[in-house]
Amino acid sequence: MVTNITSQPLEVVGGRLDPAPGRTATAGESAITLGRVETLSTEFVSGWASVQASGKHAHVLAMLGDDVIGFGMANMIRPDLQKARQEGRLHAYAFLLTFQQPVDANAVESIHVFVVGQAAMLPRAKQLRIDRSPCLRLFVLGSPRSGTSQLGSTLTKALNLPWLGEGHGAPLFARAADALTGDNTAENGLVRHLARENFRQIAVQAARSAYFHMHGSASFVDKTPGVPMIAAAPFLVECFPGSRFIFLRRNPVANIRSRLVKFGGNFEEHCRDWAAAMSEWMRVRALLPHYVEVQQEDMLEAPERIARVITDYIGIPEAAERIRESLKTDRLEQTGAGAGQTDRLQAGWTAEQVLAFDRICGPAMRAFGYG
């Protein structure tokens, strides 16, 4: 839940700073540092700060009572602040401070932000966002054309969670994390150093900051199909403990037919991509603390049961009716391939395509119980 409260002037309104920064500080404001806190959340705070000395950045800390719960630097580029710098009105940068431990929702308003060296806390924006959402991160995975868009849309609507569509961000950070992991037994000294000093955490913290910044909340839905995202799921557990993973799967005949209608392209490439996604999921799911698998056809034919399965898994049983209703009434793009078109001999494929399908998809089909 996000609420707004009213505080001091100097706000970002409609993408601009209003009133224009660079004015003489008013009574009660620091003559050295200007800034605003714009978001308070259970896992991060964000805003902007300005040190009136060109070339310097403000160091910012968040406190709850006597405890420092977040620390960092205001060094993020933002268009409105960049324009103010170019015009010589204000030397300001944005900041986002993540917390090591979540803050209780009832304590969020008690978080105060300070610029190092300044006694007064950073003022709050008039349109301050207070995000008391429970830490609910839902990752919807699967092969393309398996119903991930339908479920992603349903979850964001029924649970009122932010969703940016297909993010494809986690694989980027996961690859960086793997590169920074290092190896304590390596001959190369730098590689050993990376492992010894836990440089992997740099990528973990970067991913957390990016997800919070993009969604403006500690809770969100990320619907991204494909093998790279499936492979990144264990990394996401590192970034967001307690995350929920929902894997969508679809009969391979219906999936391949839908791919060909939607994307065209090479038949065998679609077969390989489906098989790769399913094989990668078989590997990855053993590394996750928990997950749930949903058959795309069941979302269409048994929405009430699927709604209960999902809400029991995420711990919000009261949302079952909203999810069921959305699954029944909200239909995203459909290719016309049909959930029931599952006989490869009746799919309109050539004999060579049927043989290629059996060769490529057969092992994964049998592993998941498709005849």
Label every model-predicted segment.
Residues 173, 254-258, 335:
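Short acidic/His/Gly/Ser-rich catalytic and metal-binding motifs that mark active-site loops
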Residues 113, 127-204:
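PAPS-dependent sulfotransferase catalytic core
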Residues 184-192, 266-273, 340-347:
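A polyampholytic, Gly/Pro-enriched intrinsically disordered region
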Residues 1-26, 111-113, 117, 127-129, ...:
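PAPS-dependent sulfotransferases, especially Golgi type II membrane carbohydrate sulfotransferases
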Residues 32, 197-207, 279, 286:
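Catalytic alpha-helical scaffold of carbohydrate-active enzymes acting on polysaccharides/glycoconjugates
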Residues 3-134:
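Basic, ligand-binding patches in group-transfer machinery
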Residues 178, 214-321:
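PAPS-dependent sulfotransferase catalytic domain
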